[in-house]
């Protein structure tokens, strides 16, 4: 069922100016839907929790969130946030990306089809193009893992 487990991770890229951007990607493991992609120059643990609250506003919170052991995901801020919402935090083992196969697969498609296809001039342009790609991913692309339906 939807909202059982969300997986999240970071993908990094750079603008044409050389300035780095950081994308927080969140996927529903059951529906394969891209729940959200947050695009910023930097993303703190607190910003991760704010983004998750925004993503949950219209769809509800997941029962669990799967992620790697990155600093933003293992700090006190996220730990308190999941505790307050009765969400289980599932940290994968270090060096075992196959334990989060859904988000790794999504991130590969995101990099190949969006990030590698565009040379963003600004953070605003990156956000617009990434949002358009996400919309297409969710609304028009069939996914073999769910019987060639769209999420």
Where are these regions (language model features)?
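Charged DNA-binding/catalytic regions of mobile-element recombinases
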Residues: 1-151
């Amino acid at each position: 069922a939807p909202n059982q487990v969300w997986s999240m991770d970071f993908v990094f890229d750079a603008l044409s100016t050389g300035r780095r951007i950081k994308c927080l990607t969140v996927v529903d493991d059951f529906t394969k839907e891209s729940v959200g992609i947050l695009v910023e120059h930097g993303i703190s643990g607190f910003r991760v929790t704010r983004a998750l609250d925004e993503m949950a506003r219209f769809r509800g919170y997941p029962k669990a969130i799967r992620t790697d052991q990155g600093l933003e995901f293992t700090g006190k801020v996220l730990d308190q946030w999941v505790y307050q919402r009765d969400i289980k935090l599932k940290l994968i083992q270090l060096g075992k990306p196959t334990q989060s196969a859904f988000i790794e697969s999504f991130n590969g498609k995101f990099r190949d089809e969006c990030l590698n296809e565009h040379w963003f001039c600004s953070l605003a342009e990156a956000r617009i193009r990434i949002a358009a790609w996400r919309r297409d991913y969710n609304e028009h692309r069939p996914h073999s893992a769910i019987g060639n339906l769209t999420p």
